[in-house]
Swiss-Prot record:
<dbReference type="InterPro" id="IPR001293">
    <property type="entry name" value="Znf_TRAF"/>
</dbReference>
<dbReference type="GO" id="GO:0019899">
    <property type="term" value="F:enzyme binding"/>
</dbReference>
<keyword id="KW-0862">Zinc</keyword>
<keyword id="KW-0744">Spermatogenesis</keyword>
<protein>
    <recommendedName>
        <fullName>RING finger protein 151</fullName>
    </recommendedName>
</protein>
<dbReference type="GO" id="GO:0005634">
    <property type="term" value="C:nucleus"/>
</dbReference>
<dbReference type="GO" id="GO:0007283">
    <property type="term" value="P:spermatogenesis"/>
</dbReference>
<dbReference type="GO" id="GO:0042802">
    <property type="term" value="F:identical protein binding"/>
</dbReference>
<keyword id="KW-0221">Differentiation</keyword>
<feature type="region of interest" description="Disordered">
    <location>
        <begin position="219"/>
        <end position="245"/>
    </location>
</feature>
<keyword id="KW-0863">Zinc-finger</keyword>
<feature type="zinc finger region" description="TRAF-type">
    <location>
        <begin position="101"/>
        <end position="156"/>
    </location>
</feature>
<dbReference type="GO" id="GO:0005737">
    <property type="term" value="C:cytoplasm"/>
</dbReference>
<dbReference type="InterPro" id="IPR013083">
    <property type="entry name" value="Znf_RING/FYVE/PHD"/>
</dbReference>
<dbReference type="Pfam" id="PF13923">
    <property type="entry name" value="zf-C3HC4_2"/>
</dbReference>
<comment type="subunit">
    <text>Interacts with DTNBP1.</text>
</comment>
<dbReference type="InterPro" id="IPR001841">
    <property type="entry name" value="Znf_RING"/>
</dbReference>
Amino acid sequence: MGGGYDLNLFASPPDSNFVCSVCHGVLKRPARLPCSHIFCKKCILRWLARQKTCPCCRKEVKRKKVVHMNKLRKTIGRLEVKCKNADAGCIVTCPLAHRKGHQDSCPFELTACPNEGCTSQVPRGTLAEHRQHCQQGSQQRCPLGCGATLDPAERARHNCYRELHNAWSVRQERRRPLLLSLLRRVRWLDQATSVVRRELAELSNFLEEDTALLEGAPQEEAEAAPEGNVGAEVVGEPRANIPCK
């Protein structure tokens, strides 16, 4: 892609001295070599990146010797150019340096419709008319903040409470399957907890009974031991001598 301005952009053919020998367009940001030949800055820097000689006279050139031609740039900036929308009907001509300013206000410049959801691009001069008939432009959000997008007919019968209630109902219906699933899981966990609690109670009772049995056995043995000893002593005691009559 060339670095200069398209020749067809100008209202009248430019002087040949203003034409770049590399891209054959009108000089953009002109730069001069030590040999006095002038080129677009972009064109000559690309050239010197591949070759170290002037494109015209083939003399050796060093990149640091390239000089910017600011006065020539201003001269070219005063040349009259056509509007980029000339084919669409714009007949305005203006200095090259002012081309951007005209483009920002040109009634033939294509402009995107600002209405949300509309992808149309229309000439700036007809934008106001387009917005009056734009289907997307006729839709607006509820000014009370419920979030509904309404056209003129809907705005006349719109009820925020009803819209919010309907939205809430839809959300509840979407949540119902999840809530039912969670409820079934809670019930299952409650049943499982009851079973575990009952088994723990039975285990606790069993341990208490077992502990009581273990604690009662030594006491019974201790109480039985003295009775046995007394009996032994009685049996083993010698009999008293009974005098004979």
